[in-house]
Amino acid sequence: MKTIDYRGDTRTSKNQSDADGYSSCSTLKGDVEISGTYSGDLQLNGVKQISGGLSCDGASNMTGLSASSLNSIGDTFKLTGLTTLTTLSFAALTKVGSIEFTALPQLQSLDFTKGVTEAGSVVITNTGLSSLNGISLETVGGFDITENTNLKTVNVNNLKNATALINFAGNMDGLEIEFPNLGTGQNMTFRNVSSVSVPSLEKLKGQLGFWGNKFQSFSAPNLTETSDLIFNDNSKLSNISMPVLKTVNGGFQIARSDKLNVIDFPKLETVTGAIDFSGEFNEAHLDSLKLVRGDFNMQSTGNISCTTFDNMAKNREVIKGTETCKTTSNPETRDGKSGSTTSTGKASATSTGAASALDVSSMPAMGLAAVFGALVQYAL
């Protein structure tokens, strides 16, 4: 087997004969592009390595793509707009520079027999996939999975570290996500999922956010530190368990999660931004809290006790910003939006604790900061 060097050039396959021209080559140095006019199935036989990327854009009549011997793609594996593709078979593939699969509505499964264990990033959007079996990453940069409305389960069992955003949004409402061995990461955001399992997660450098999900319970038994922490509009959420969470390096918001009756973070000591809890809960326990650099807003329809938090605000000993704590029929978030699904969010007279507002400036959080920009505040 030989090596063909196409560095600085892109080889375009317009038909199977073009692809067969590579069959005597174990290594292709350069990029391989499949023509957007290709129709039917395409096989890349014999090739074991592509140093550049492998791509196909707009081949709406391509039905299958396979490469039984290919074990690595040095750059991006990019497939876009292959609207009739039903087969993607790469039995030996274990390493890619990155994966970008977009608009593959007929593709229901990945035939990656050995499993892709190395990828700089993964973006999968608007496909027919029901699972991500075949993606067996141990580490990854970004992991962005969106608009896959047939996606039922994601279990990346071997993943231990992520260095960029992990994002799930717009997939099947019943999507169940498992990262059983993920220990550290950057940012993680989840929308419209039915369960998230992160039993080994210990530390996030960025945010952890949940919006509009359907799960009843969330547990992070080993998480000690994260940046912004957000639970917003999770209508069925009745339990949050983070028994060893100690530090939130940013803002902490719980809002519009009306089934949540008790808020309890027994080991939480430090929040460097604002605390913003609103809803219909009856109890709130932050027994270890020593420092809140920003404002403190707690509003609920439930009969909450504010004595402890009022005392924390005295002389700015714990709460450095403005403290608002009250029972009200219209709980609001810190920025005046409705804090429960039954509240109006209209402005109303409030009583505040002893701490007056500091001259604070907003510091944008990492990742999707615009979603909750005003939440994160730091004392000057």
Residue ranges and their predicted role:
Residues 330, 336-358:
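Low-complexity, Pro/Ser/Thr-rich intrinsically disordered segments
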Residues 311-314, 357-359:
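Short, intrinsically disordered, charge-biased short linear motifs at domain edges
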Residues 320-341, 370-373:
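Acidic, glycine- and Ser/Thr-rich low-complexity intrinsically disordered tracts
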Residues 351-380:
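Cleavable C-terminal sorting propeptides in eukaryotic secreted/cell-surface proteins
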Residues 1-7, 375-380:
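N-terminal signal peptide
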Residues 5-21, 28-43, 50-85, 89-107, ...:
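Concave beta-strand-loop units of leucine-rich repeat
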